[in-house]
C-alpha cells in the first residue's frame, strides 16, 4: 500500500526530446505545448535549458520536466549521462519535411538511447512527426517528404506510439506528451508493485 501511496503523490517525470536537426521544429513544439504560443522562428536558446509543465493524466497531476536535446550534450560523458541516465522517457521528433531528421533518429539517436539509457526509460518512447513550419519549410515545402507509412510501420514494429502533430494549427500537440507520461506512470506502477 505504501508504494501505491507514493505514486499518488506529486510525480515529476524527466522527458528528453530527441531530434536536434533544425527542421524538427522542437522549439516551436515546446513553445506551443508549454506557453500555448506558436512561432515559426523561435529564438535560439544558449546553454542548458528545460521547460516545465503540469498535465493531468488519468486524474493525476504530473509535472513534466522537458529537456530538449542539444547537439552539444554528447560532447562529454557527464553531459551524456545526465541526458540519458536521468531520463524517464523520450519524445523522438522528426520533421515531416526532412528525411534526414528521421534517418538521424534511427541511425544515431536510437543507438545512443540503447547504449546509454537506463532500462526503464528505454521502454518509454513516443515517435512524433512534426509538421512545423520552420524557416526552411515555411511556405517552401508544403508536402510531406517523409513517408508516414514507413515511419508508422517502424513505430509499430517497435511498439512505439506514433503521433502526427502541427503546432501552428494546434493539432495533436498535447497528445504525445500525455501518452509518454501515461507510459512512464504505468511502468512506474508496475515496477512499484514488484
Curated annotation (Swiss-Prot):
CDD domains: Rab. SUPFAM superfamilies: P-loop containing nucleoside triphosphate hydrolases. Pfam families: Ras (PF00071). Coiled coil: none annotated. A motif (Effector region) lies at residues 42-50. GTP binds at residues 19-27, 68-72, 130-133. This is Ras-related protein RabU. It comes from Dictyostelium discoideum (Social amoeba). GO terms for cellular component: endomembrane system. PROSITE patterns: RAB. The keyword Transferase does not apply. InterPro entries: P-loop_NTPase (IPR027417), Small_GTPase (IPR001806), Small_GTPase_Rab (IPR050305). It comes from the Eukaryota. Keywords: GTP-binding, Nucleotide-binding. One of its GO terms (biological process) is intracellular protein transport. One of its GO terms (molecular function) is GTPase activity. Belongs to the small GTPase superfamily. Rab family.
